[in-house]
């Protein structure tokens, strides 16, 4: 998983495709506030997780962490997790 700078934000690329029956969500946090995600952790929108943008474009600040989770569509239970450090957006 990589994060590259773009004007006004970042583009996050996840090499692996989403497996059938799963959905992808993400959260951006400070490095010292990364979420703990284990197998079956609930990553629903009520818990602050966001739907994955088809473009992979997100908006954060330099050195924040983007955590990306593939989860079940029913119950939003985590199945896979990745993270990357965001670069500063370009001007």
Language-model region placement:
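Extracellular interdomain linker/stem segments of modular secreted and single-pass surface proteins
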Residues: 85-91
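Surface-exposed, short loops/turns at beta-strand junctions within beta-sandwich domains
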Residues: 49-63
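Beta-strand-rich modules
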Residues: 59-82
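Short beta-strand segments within Ig-like beta-sandwich modules, predominantly Fibronectin type-III
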Residues: 39-52
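Short beta-strand elements bearing conserved aromatic residues within extracellular beta-rich modules
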Residues: 22-27
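Acidic, Ser/Thr
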Residues: 13-21
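Short coil/turn motif common to extracellular beta-sandwich-like domains
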Residues: 4-14
């Amino acid at each position: 998983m990589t994060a590259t700078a773009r004007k006004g934000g970042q583009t996050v690329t996840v090499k692996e495709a989403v497996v059938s029956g799963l959905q992808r969500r993400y959260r951006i946090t400070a490095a010292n506030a990364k979420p703990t995600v284990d197998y079956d952790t609930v990553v629903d929108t009520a818990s602050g997780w966001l739907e994955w943008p088809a473009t992979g474009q997100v908006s954060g600040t330099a050195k924040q962490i983007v955590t990306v989770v593939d989860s079940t569509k029913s119950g939003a239970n985590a199945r896979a997790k990745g993270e990357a450090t965001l670069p500063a957006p370009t001007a």
